[in-house]
């Protein structure tokens, strides 16, 4: 896992009706009287504002009812057209919800006072404690999140945490987490499961999947810069090649560009010994793709559908982020390494092409 990620949860699960559905949300905010605090939910990428209250004496209170918990945000805005500022994220559920600092040691504002919000706050505190040890933090937090998903596989906490973090886990972990959920949730995460199952097919030890010119529907064909067909199979079967690295990249991708010096060093040193690179670009337009190839001196093989993320190779190799790469042994047709970064490419070639 390469990143430390903060929890952002969302949701939905059923509770009883009647008086138990009443909720209050209270908090303090250093702001002038009359400033509005908004309660909003998220639908896709859009915010849906469902209520607002005015600050009075540096405090605000929302009151309402709900028959099912849902994920929401408290926001402020400096004007109608201004970008909203986050006050807190919370679960709206029956009970008295308080927005406050947990303590002086953990000054970040959290929602507490009801079961789901208390669970989220507890997980947040555990994460902060783990982050004190920077060396072990990333793996420990990943483990904490995954264990929390499994422990809450039957409720909103686990489902939301999975949505926020699934791309950090190994394919089998994703499959196992979904399998632990109720049937209805498994159906909602069907595409995640299918992607994880596909990712299992391109782990080291598996045969490569050919990359061809075929587009899907109206999807553009995957072609070379001069508009020709260059299948990955033809590169593997070229007797001059012993090892081929499939490199998924794009000219607009900063991390991809930072890998270029390392790829060039490995290519210049080992190309004549049988090392080839087959670059698959996720560029949207031809001009920046071709410009990057020319200006950066990327003198290896290149193909692209010039269609951003919508290309068959991306799905076949279960690529969720770039840069991504897969090293194939031409003699066996099998993938022998993945996600080589920095000097790892050159070191791997030194090991293989002594």
Which role fits each region the language model picked out?
Residues 221-244, 269:
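A short beta-strand-turn-helix
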Residues 239-244, 272-275, 297-300, 331:
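Loop/turn elements at helix/coil->beta-strand transitions in domains of secreted/extracellular proteins
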Residues 97-102, 138-219:
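N-terminal targeting signals for export/organelle localization
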Residues 296-298, 305-354:
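Thiol/disulfide oxidoreductase modules built on the thioredoxin-like
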Residues 17-148:
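A non-transmembrane, solvent-exposed segment enriched in polar/low-complexity residues
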Residues 248-265, 282:
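Conserved redox-active cysteine motifs that mediate thiol-disulfide chemistry
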